[in-house]
Regions:
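PDZ/PDZ-like domain segments forming the peptide/carboxylate-binding groove
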Residues: 783-836, 910
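A flexible loop/linker signature enriched in serine peptidases of the S9 family
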Residues: 20-23, 41-47, 60-66, 79-91, ...
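Beta-strand-rich domains and repeat architectures in extracellular enzymes and scaffolds
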Residues: 21-47, 316-335, 615-631
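Bacterial Sec-dependent N-terminal signal peptides
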Residues: 1-21
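Blade-terminus and WD-like Trp-Asp/Gly-His loop motifs, strongest in beta-propeller folds
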Residues: 30-35, 69-77, 113-120, 166-174, ...
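A short helix->beta-strand "capping" segment at the edge of beta-propeller domains
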Residues: 20-26, 54-56, 301-317, 398-404, ...
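Cleft-lining beta-strand/loop regions that shape enzyme active-site pockets
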Residues: 804, 831-938
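Extended, small/polar residue-biased N-terminal targeting/export presequences
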Residues: 748-798, 862-866, 871-887
Length: 940
């Protein structure tokens, strides 16, 4: 599948030049304090423009993403965030451009918030809370606020509590928006306990925090008015985000703008009272008592992106299909279909679109491929056929013909050829099984969609019978969406559906075996189940539809050998008789060539008496297949580290590992059953069963990467997914068609994944639904900053780092050491830590590596060295979480006088459930009169 966050079609770019007189999607706009200039982000760079409008000046030109500009009080410099070192760091640059100076070096993400004065910048980062903080320790969700000099150096913590969108008046009082919990930042219209409010922080000997707004929805982005007494902010109090004015302590607010559809964003104010804000992708200003004025901007800049980038790829296949002769495999790579030789790297590109193709299948004659493609926002079926009769293989074909197979207004995908090649079954609207006759193009329904439930595309399974008259499918029946069964369907769409398994457990992935006389399927009826979440271990079972086949399957090795000898003798006898009649021999040869398949007959009345469990151990299985003779089961299972290929000899009852760590995927045998093909995360493979030999299937695929085209496709894909699958049919009254047009027009002005993710989140935010939004994360710093697992004394201003507390289970607690709170770390690997100097570079890339700390103990006057292995910040955050839980437990115990227990639910997963189950029912908890269940979830 096309990876989230990439492009719009080149045709869409033809309508404008790179001297853009009306650019859109200008974000993070902020007016300078002197009111003369506006800085903003456009296409990943920082620009400035006169407040009256005109030609914008490009301040940064680095290929990295630059964002979030903040003006210095004297309007001479701009601080901004950039990922030019792999993660977002804070930089500062002159207002007219030049070489920026890097101010922060930690490998996390740092974003500037405001200047405290001309010499210091406040920024947000999730580095380390204070030892006294009660804020829930999450990975980057509840950041601290730090101050750093414009010359760089060691950051100083200002607040361990999250403070977003800070504005500071002349007296030093800070306005900020709070953060109470996790929700997508761009979600709109929600009224909930975690909606943001405006607060005021007054520093001093006795710092004061005062809540200024109480609306149950979102209040954001406060900025002081020039008088330092009143302030402006954004609120959804009357529908969409608009600008309001309020005085601290006054319950009434004055609404200044009255937009009804799109939100106002990025509010800022100059010392002359002029406001600046973003709306509908453009920038506006507003003078007190006046009317809003759009800032007309033109941008002239070089273009550093391309409509199409030619690439050659040798990895990345996500699915595959094996040709009938086993000489080729069709596969999907980044949404395009290819065919490659099994033995050679030669590769033929079948499709070349910025859209997504998937679920490819070969016709029985090997000359046609069928696949699904989401073109124009709608999944439909397409075929590609070898035109020249003298060409037998797709890999070397010189002429192909693509045709659209379905022409409906319903999503159609997951096509599968019938064994006789006359029809194709597919899914319509994700759960209805339909069949199209390739000769007449008539389409019929085999199973109504109400009998299946699809959570995500591709989660449904069905398979044709060998005689092309029946289909096995997953099935939920009535009210069984969480307990799938296997159903037998008549492919003509008539007759009664038969629930073959009728189980309260999950049964699925059924496959025809033994020529259609039986099926194998997976079931979790015997496996260990997750104690507190989804999932269970599976087994493979076989069900026989034929009594004779069942009896034969139960024969031991000796009985089977005797039967096969008898059948061989009978066949040889029949063959000698046929040789006497040459004409009959030719007729029989022709019949063999046709390989006519006899219609299947089913004895279903006794099917439950003919079920055999094939696997000896329940496990987490990826797939399974039965040999053609039915004497061996092959399956992919994980017991330790990675998926292994197992073989279970059913006649000898011997189980062994054929190959270790082959990966997870679908097992696809060739026609003779001698080889297994597998598409795993690490590539496509051919496995020769005899000898357990595995060979990579290599390819060289030409790929046309179209960044703009892919972004347009992904936009349409996401819009359609919501339209098809949102949990309420009316989309909560959202004008979804209208918003598609609103946001799609921004695509030509977006050239990077950060902006694209933000734009998608803005559109999805219109739904007012939780768990929505798009994400893009930078690659991260090449050398992540390591952690020592200690709290430092923020009040200490001398050389080195003074330890305030050593966190339990951190590196310094795992060995006998003289290091204790109060000690000062003077050097790291021999490099001295000077007062005010940035020490993070000394720990770059050192997690898990031995580091020598030079330590001074002021109490004893002793200096000594300590060797340890620092941990990652992720590992340190886990220790902080455990410390936080223990502190909460102690507080509850203290405040209740030991009468109330405390447990915390870490996440929505099985380990978290097991933890609370153990803690809640432990003897210490059972002695309590009540329990506090804390449900603040740790998102990782």
């Amino acid at each position: 599948m096309k990876k989230l966050l990439l492009g719009i079609a080149a045709a869409c770019l033809a309508g404008f030049t790179f001297a853009q007189d009306a650019p859109l999607w200008m974000r993070h706009s902020v007016i300078s304090p002197d009111g003369t200039t506006i800085a903003f982000t456009y296409k990943g760079d920082i620009y400035t423009v006169p407040v009256a409008g005109g030609r914008a000046m490009q301040i940064t030109t680095n290929p990295a993403y630059d964002t979030a500009p903040v003006w210095s009080p004297d309007s001479k410099r701009i601080a901004f965030a950039s990922d030019r070192m792999g993660s977002l760091d804070v930089y500062i640059v002159a207002k007219d451009g030049g070489e920026p100076r890097r101010l922060t070096t930690h490998s996390g993400s740092e974003t500037p918030l405001a200047f405290t004065d001309a010499g210091h910048v406040l920024f947000s980062a999730g580095i380390m809370p204070s030892a006294e903080a009660v804020v829930f320790p999450s990975n980057g969700q509840f950041n601290q606020v730090y101050r750093v000099s414009v010359e760089g150096g060691r950051p100083t913590m200002i607040s361990s509590m999250p403070m977003e969108c800070i504005s500071i008046n002349k007296e030093g009082a800070m306005l900020y928006q709070d953060k109470k919990g996790y929700e997508d930042y761009w979600r709109k219209h929600h009224v909930s306990p975690i909606a943001r409010d405006i607060w005021m922080y007054t520093p001093g000997k006795e710092p004061q925090y005062r809540q200024l707004t109480t609306f149950g929805g979102e209040d954001r982005e406060p900025v002081w008015a020039p008088d330092g007494k009143t302030f402006y902010y954004l609120s959804e109090e009357n529908g969409s985000f608009n600008i309001y004015r309020r005085t601290p302590g006054d319950a009434k607010a004055v609404q200044l703008t009255h937009y009804t559809k799109n939100p106002v964003r990025y509010l800022s104010a100059a010392t002359d009272g002029r406001l600046c804000y973003g709306f509908d992708g453009e920038i506006y200003t507003l003078l007190p008592g006046g009317e809003a004025q759009k800032v007309n901007i033109s941008i002239v800049s070089d273009r550093n992106d391309k409509d199409i980038i030619r690439q050659i790829k040798s990895s990345g296949a996500t699915e595959m299909a094996v040709s009938p002769d086993g000489k080729e495999v069709a596969f999907v790579l980044r949404g395009d279909v290819y065919v490659t030789s099994v033995e050679y790297k030669t590769t033929k590109q079948i499709t070349n679109t910025p859209c997504q193709e998937r679920t490819v299948d070969f016709a029985p004659d090997g000359r046609t491929l069928v696949y699904a493609s989401e073109r124009g926002g709608l999944w439909q079926l397409y075929t590609s056929t070898i035109v020249r009769k003298d060409e037998k293989l797709f890999t070397y074909a010189t002429e192909l013909k693509e045709e659209r197979l379905t022409n409906s207004d319903a999503a159609s995908f997951q096509p599968q050829y019938s064994p006789d090649g006359k029809e194709i079954a597919f899914l319509e609207n994700r759960s209805t099984i339909r069949v199209i006759n390739l000769k007449t193009k008539d389409v019929r329904t085999v199973m109504d969609g109400k009998y299946q439930y699809s959570y995500s595309d591709g989660d449904q399974w069905f398979q044709w019978s060998p005689d092309s008259k029946w289909i096995l499918s997953d099935y939920i029946g009535v009210g069984g969406w969480n307990n799938k069964d296997v159903v037998l369907l008549n492919a003509d769409g008539k007759g009664e559906m038969v629930n073959l398994t009728e189980s309260g457990y999950n049964d699925g992935n059924a496959k025809w075996v033994l020529g259609g006389k039986a099926m194998i399927w997976t079931s979790d009826r015997a496996g260990y189940r997750s104690h507190g979440s989804w999932g269970a271990e599976d087994d493979t079972y076989i069900m026989f539809f034929d009594a004779e086949a069942y009896d034969r399957f139960l024969m031991n090795k000796e009985e089977t050998a005797l039967l096969e000898e008898a059948e061989k003798a009978e066949k040889e006898k029949a063959g000698k008789k046929d040789e006497k009649d040459a004409k009959k021999k030719k007729e029989d040869a022709d019949k063999d060539k046709e390989k006519k398949v006899e219609p299947l007959k089913f004895d279903l009345a006794n099917r439950f008496d003919r079920i055999v469990r094939l696997t000896v151990n329940s496990s987490h299985m990826a797939d399974a297949m039965l040999s053609a003779k039915g004497d061996k089961l092959y399956y992919l299972s994980v017991f330790e580290d990675g998926y292994d290929l197992w073989e279970h000899n059913l006649k000898e009852n011997v189980t062994k590992v054929l190959l270790k760590k082959v990966g997870a995927g679908a097992l696809q045998p060739d026609k003779e059953g001698k080889n297994i093909f597998l598409c795993a995360r690490d590539g496509m493979k051919k496995i020769e069963i005899e000898g357990s030999k595995i060979s990579p299937i290599e390819f060289e695929a030409f790929f046309d990467y179209r960044p703009y085209g892919e972004r347009e496709y992904i936009f349409d894909h996401i819009w359609q997914q919501v339209n098809d699958k949102f949990y309420v049919a009316d989309l909560q009254g959202t004008d979804w068609n209208g918003y598609k047009e609103t946001y799609k027009r921004f695509l030509p002005y977006i050239n990077n994944n950060y902006d694209f993710a933000e734009m998608l989140s803005e559109m999805l935010g219109e739904l007012n639904g939780s768990h929505t939004g798009a994400r893009y994360y930078a690659s991260g710093a090449a050398l992540p900053t390591a952690a020592l697992g200690v709290f430092y004394d923020e009040a200490y201003a001398g050389d080195g780092l003074k330890i305030k507390e050593i966190i339990a289970q951190s590196p310094l607690t795992k060995k006998k050491t003289d290091v204790k709170p109060g000690c000062i770390i003077e050097k790291v690997d021999g490099v001295a830590i000077k007062a005010g100097a940035d020490y993070f570079p000394l720990l770059e890339g050192k997690a898990g590596r031995k580091v020598i700390l030079s330590v001074y103990d002021p109490v004893t006057g002793k200096r000594f060295e300590e060797t340890l292995k620092p941990i990652s910040y992720g590992a340190q955050n886990e220790l902080l979480y455990k410390r936080w839980v223990e502190n909460c437990r102690k507080k509850v115990d203290e405040y209740s006088g030991g009468r109330i227990a405390y447990i915390h639910i870490k996440g929505m997963d099985s380990p978290s459930f097991r933890k609370i189950y153990s803690d809640l029912l432990s003897e210490s908890s059972r002695k309590k009169e009540a329990v506090v269940v804390d449900t603040c979830l740790l998102y990782t």
